Protein backbone atom coordinates (compact mmCIF):
# COMPACT_ATOMS: atom_id res chain seq x y z
CA UNK A 1 0.00 0.00 0.00
CA UNK A 2 1.49 3.25 -1.10
CA UNK A 3 1.95 6.12 1.39
CA UNK A 4 0.25 9.41 0.55
CA UNK A 5 0.82 12.76 2.29
CA UNK A 6 -2.08 14.21 4.21
CA UNK A 7 -4.00 16.98 2.46
CA UNK A 8 -3.05 20.56 3.31
CA UNK A 9 -5.50 22.43 5.53
CA UNK A 10 -7.42 25.09 3.69
CA UNK A 11 -7.74 28.63 5.16
CA UNK A 12 -11.21 29.78 6.06
CA UNK A 13 -12.94 32.00 3.60
CA UNK A 14 -12.23 35.70 4.20
CA UNK A 15 -15.27 37.93 4.81
CA UNK A 16 -16.27 40.40 2.11
CA UNK A 17 -14.56 43.78 2.20
CA UNK A 18 -17.68 45.79 1.47
CA UNK A 19 -20.00 46.48 4.35
CA UNK A 20 -23.69 46.35 3.74
CA UNK A 21 -25.12 49.36 5.63
CA UNK A 22 -28.62 48.18 5.03
CA UNK A 23 -27.98 45.06 7.17
CA UNK A 24 -26.62 47.18 10.05
CA UNK A 25 -29.50 49.63 10.17
CA UNK A 26 -30.98 50.50 13.52
CA UNK A 27 -34.02 48.42 14.30
CA UNK A 28 -37.20 50.35 13.73
CA UNK A 29 -35.68 52.73 11.18
CA UNK A 30 -35.29 52.35 7.48
CA UNK A 31 -31.99 52.62 5.69
CA UNK A 32 -33.19 55.75 3.84
CA UNK A 33 -33.70 57.69 7.08
CA UNK A 34 -30.24 56.74 8.37
CA UNK A 35 -28.51 57.76 5.15
CA UNK A 36 -30.41 61.08 5.08
CA UNK A 37 -29.40 61.90 8.66
CA UNK A 38 -25.76 61.03 7.96
CA UNK A 39 -25.74 63.20 4.85
CA UNK A 40 -27.25 66.16 6.76
CA UNK A 41 -24.66 65.84 9.55
CA UNK A 42 -21.82 65.73 7.02
CA UNK A 43 -23.14 68.77 5.14
CA UNK A 44 -23.59 70.93 8.28
CA UNK A 45 -21.00 69.88 10.88
CA UNK A 46 -21.45 73.04 13.01
CA UNK A 47 -25.22 72.80 13.32
CA UNK A 48 -25.14 70.18 16.05
CA UNK A 49 -22.64 72.22 18.07
CA UNK A 50 -24.86 75.31 17.87
CA UNK A 51 -27.89 73.30 18.91
CA UNK A 52 -26.00 71.93 21.91
CA UNK A 53 -24.81 75.42 22.87
CA UNK A 54 -28.33 76.81 22.61
CA UNK A 55 -29.73 74.04 24.80
CA UNK A 56 -26.96 74.66 27.34
CA UNK A 57 -27.74 78.39 27.52
CA UNK A 58 -31.44 77.77 27.87
CA UNK A 59 -30.85 75.27 30.62
CA UNK A 60 -28.30 77.41 32.49
CA UNK A 61 -25.19 75.52 31.46
CA UNK A 62 -26.39 71.99 31.65
CA UNK A 63 -29.03 72.11 34.33
CA UNK A 64 -31.11 74.64 36.24
CA UNK A 65 -32.09 78.17 35.33
CA UNK A 66 -29.80 81.10 34.50
CA UNK A 67 -29.26 83.24 37.60
CA UNK A 68 -27.29 86.34 38.48
CA UNK A 69 -23.72 85.47 39.44
CA UNK A 70 -23.44 88.21 42.08
CA UNK A 71 -23.17 86.73 45.55
CA UNK A 72 -26.30 87.24 47.60
CA UNK A 73 -28.49 87.86 44.55
CA UNK A 74 -29.24 84.67 42.64
CA UNK A 75 -32.15 86.26 40.80
CA UNK A 76 -33.55 83.98 38.13
CA UNK A 77 -33.02 85.67 34.79
CA UNK A 78 -36.36 84.90 33.20
CA UNK A 79 -38.10 87.40 30.97
CA UNK A 80 -35.10 89.75 30.96
CA UNK A 81 -33.00 91.08 28.11
CA UNK A 82 -30.77 88.65 26.28
CA UNK A 83 -27.79 90.85 27.18
CA UNK A 84 -28.21 90.27 30.93
CA UNK A 85 -29.06 86.63 30.41
CA UNK A 86 -25.95 86.06 28.31
CA UNK A 87 -23.58 87.67 30.83
CA UNK A 88 -25.40 86.25 33.85
CA UNK A 89 -26.00 89.52 35.65
CA UNK A 90 -29.25 91.22 36.55
CA UNK A 91 -29.96 94.76 35.39
CA UNK A 92 -29.63 96.22 38.89
CA UNK A 93 -26.21 94.72 39.65
CA UNK A 94 -24.89 95.65 36.21
CA UNK A 95 -25.04 99.28 37.40
CA UNK A 96 -23.81 98.81 40.95
CA UNK A 97 -20.46 100.51 41.76
CA UNK A 98 -19.37 97.54 43.87
CA UNK A 99 -20.48 93.91 43.97
CA UNK A 100 -18.97 90.64 45.15
CA UNK A 101 -18.36 87.95 42.56
CA UNK A 102 -16.50 84.74 43.46
CA UNK A 103 -15.46 86.26 46.78
CA UNK A 104 -13.86 89.40 45.28
CA UNK A 105 -15.11 92.94 44.85
CA UNK A 106 -15.91 93.70 41.25
CA UNK A 107 -17.71 96.17 39.01
CA UNK A 108 -19.46 95.39 35.75
CA UNK A 109 -17.92 97.20 32.76
CA UNK A 110 -20.49 98.50 30.29
CA UNK A 111 -17.97 98.39 27.43
CA UNK A 112 -16.33 95.02 28.06
CA UNK A 113 -19.56 93.38 29.32
CA UNK A 114 -17.75 91.61 32.14
CA UNK A 115 -16.63 92.19 35.71
CA UNK A 116 -13.33 93.97 36.48
CA UNK A 117 -11.43 94.80 39.65
CA UNK A 118 -12.27 98.16 41.20
CA UNK A 119 -8.73 99.41 40.55
CA UNK A 120 -9.40 99.37 36.79
CA UNK A 121 -12.07 102.08 37.07
CA UNK A 122 -11.80 105.83 37.63
CA UNK A 123 -13.96 106.95 40.54
CA UNK A 124 -17.55 105.88 39.80
CA UNK A 125 -17.21 105.34 36.07
CA UNK A 126 -19.10 102.36 34.75
CA UNK A 127 -16.54 101.68 32.02
CA UNK A 128 -12.98 100.58 32.68
CA UNK A 129 -10.08 102.96 32.19
CA UNK A 130 -8.68 101.22 29.13
CA UNK A 131 -11.98 101.27 27.23
CA UNK A 132 -12.59 104.92 28.10
CA UNK A 133 -9.15 105.85 26.80
CA UNK A 134 -9.80 104.08 23.49
CA UNK A 135 -13.23 105.68 23.20
CA UNK A 136 -11.88 109.19 23.78
CA UNK A 137 -9.05 108.61 21.32
CA UNK A 138 -11.55 107.77 18.58
CA UNK A 139 -13.55 110.91 19.29
CA UNK A 140 -10.58 113.21 18.88
CA UNK A 141 -10.60 114.80 15.44
CA UNK A 142 -7.29 115.54 13.71
CA UNK A 143 -6.68 119.15 12.78
CA UNK A 144 -6.71 119.00 8.99
CA UNK A 145 -7.74 122.63 8.35
CA UNK A 146 -4.26 124.07 8.91
CA UNK A 147 -3.29 126.27 5.97
CA UNK A 148 0.18 126.03 4.55
CA UNK A 149 1.90 129.25 3.54
CA UNK A 150 4.89 127.55 1.95
CA UNK A 151 3.80 128.18 -1.63
CA UNK A 152 5.84 130.82 -3.44
CA UNK A 153 3.00 132.07 -5.68
CA UNK A 154 -0.35 132.41 -3.88
CA UNK A 155 -3.50 131.62 -5.83
CA UNK A 156 -5.73 134.41 -7.03
CA UNK A 157 -8.49 133.29 -4.65
CA UNK A 158 -6.42 134.64 -1.76
CA UNK A 159 -6.36 138.12 -3.28
CA UNK A 160 -9.89 138.21 -4.69
CA UNK A 161 -13.11 136.77 -3.36
CA UNK A 162 -15.97 135.28 -5.37
CA UNK A 163 -17.36 138.75 -6.20
CA UNK A 164 -14.00 139.86 -7.63
CA UNK A 165 -13.56 142.28 -4.73
CA UNK A 166 -10.16 142.98 -3.24
CA UNK A 167 -9.45 140.95 -0.13
CA UNK A 168 -7.27 141.93 2.81
CA UNK A 169 -5.41 138.69 3.24
CA UNK A 170 -2.11 140.47 2.57
CA UNK A 171 -2.53 142.49 5.73
CA UNK A 172 -1.23 139.54 7.77
CA UNK A 173 2.42 140.64 7.63
CA UNK A 174 4.06 142.05 10.80
CA UNK A 175 4.00 145.80 11.17
CA UNK A 176 7.79 146.02 11.08
CA UNK A 177 7.78 144.63 7.54
CA UNK A 178 5.34 147.19 6.17
CA UNK A 179 6.65 150.57 5.09
CA UNK A 180 4.30 153.59 4.93
CA UNK A 181 3.88 155.58 1.77
CA UNK A 182 6.99 157.67 1.38
CA UNK A 183 5.44 160.15 -1.02
CA UNK A 184 1.80 160.42 -1.98
CA UNK A 185 1.31 159.29 -5.55
CA UNK A 186 -0.95 162.26 -6.18
CA UNK A 187 1.56 164.97 -5.11
CA UNK A 188 3.75 164.86 -8.19
CA UNK A 189 2.26 164.70 -11.63
CA UNK A 190 5.62 164.18 -13.29
CA UNK A 191 5.63 160.54 -12.31
CA UNK A 192 2.14 159.88 -13.60
CA UNK A 193 1.37 159.34 -17.25
CA UNK A 194 -1.86 158.60 -19.10
CA UNK A 195 -2.25 156.61 -22.25
CA UNK A 196 -5.59 155.52 -23.75
CA UNK A 197 -7.40 156.52 -20.59
CA UNK A 198 -5.19 154.34 -18.32
CA UNK A 199 -2.88 155.62 -15.64
CA UNK A 200 0.73 154.41 -15.56
CA UNK A 201 3.06 155.11 -12.65
CA UNK A 202 6.79 154.98 -12.37
CA UNK A 203 7.85 151.54 -11.16
CA UNK A 204 10.45 153.01 -8.79
CA UNK A 205 7.74 155.12 -7.17
CA UNK A 206 5.52 152.07 -6.76
CA UNK A 207 8.30 150.11 -5.07
CA UNK A 208 8.61 152.83 -2.40
CA UNK A 209 4.94 152.63 -1.53
CA UNK A 210 4.41 148.88 -1.50
CA UNK A 211 4.80 146.71 1.62
CA UNK A 212 8.10 144.88 1.88
CA UNK A 213 7.05 141.58 0.35
CA UNK A 214 9.57 139.10 -0.92
CA UNK A 215 7.53 138.63 -4.08
CA UNK A 216 7.50 140.87 -7.14
CA UNK A 217 4.44 142.99 -7.93
CA UNK A 218 3.80 140.98 -11.08
CA UNK A 219 3.54 137.79 -9.00
CA UNK A 220 1.24 139.36 -6.44
CA UNK A 221 -1.27 140.50 -9.05
CA UNK A 222 -2.41 137.58 -11.20
CA UNK A 223 -4.39 139.84 -13.57
CA UNK A 224 -2.05 141.84 -15.84
CA UNK A 225 -4.67 144.31 -17.11
CA UNK A 226 -5.23 146.07 -13.79
CA UNK A 227 -5.09 149.86 -13.95
CA UNK A 228 -2.76 151.82 -11.68
CA UNK A 229 -5.69 153.54 -9.96
CA UNK A 230 -7.03 150.18 -8.80
CA UNK A 231 -3.60 149.21 -7.51
CA UNK A 232 -3.24 152.43 -5.54
CA UNK A 233 -6.74 152.08 -4.16
CA UNK A 234 -5.90 148.60 -2.89
CA UNK A 235 -2.65 149.60 -1.20
CA UNK A 236 -4.20 152.81 0.11
CA UNK A 237 -6.84 150.79 1.94
CA UNK A 238 -4.10 148.43 3.09
CA UNK A 239 -2.10 151.36 4.50
CA UNK A 240 -5.16 152.70 6.36
CA UNK A 241 -5.84 149.29 7.85
CA UNK A 242 -2.20 148.98 8.93
CA UNK A 243 -2.30 152.39 10.56
CA UNK A 244 -5.45 151.43 12.46
CA UNK A 245 -3.81 148.31 13.81
CA UNK A 246 -0.76 150.36 14.83
CA UNK A 247 -2.96 152.74 16.80
CA UNK A 248 -4.75 149.86 18.48
CA UNK A 249 -1.45 148.31 19.53
CA UNK A 250 -0.45 151.51 21.38
CA UNK A 251 -3.60 151.51 23.55
Swiss-Prot record:
Expressed in stems, leaf sheaths, and young panicles. PROSITE patterns: ZF_SBP. The keyword Ribonucleoprotein does not apply. SUPFAM superfamilies: SBT domain (SSF103612). A motif (Bipartite nuclear localization signal) lies at residues 125-141. Induction: Negatively regulated by microRNAs miR156b and miR156h. Keywords: DNA-binding, Metal-binding, Nucleus, Transcription, Transcription regulation, Zinc, Zinc-finger. Zn(2+) 1 binds at residues 68, 73, 90, 93. Residues 24-43 have a biased composition (Low complexity). It comes from the Eukaryota. A zinc finger (SBP-type) spans 65-142. It is found in: Nucleus. GO terms for cellular component: nucleus. InterPro entries: SBP-like, SBP_dom, SBP_sf. One of its GO terms (molecular function) is DNA binding. Residues 1-64 are annotated as: Disordered. The keyword Phosphoprotein does not apply. Zn(2+) 2 binds at residues 109, 112, 116, 128. This is Squamosa promoter-binding-like protein 4. It comes from Oryza sativa subsp. japonica. The gene is SPL4.
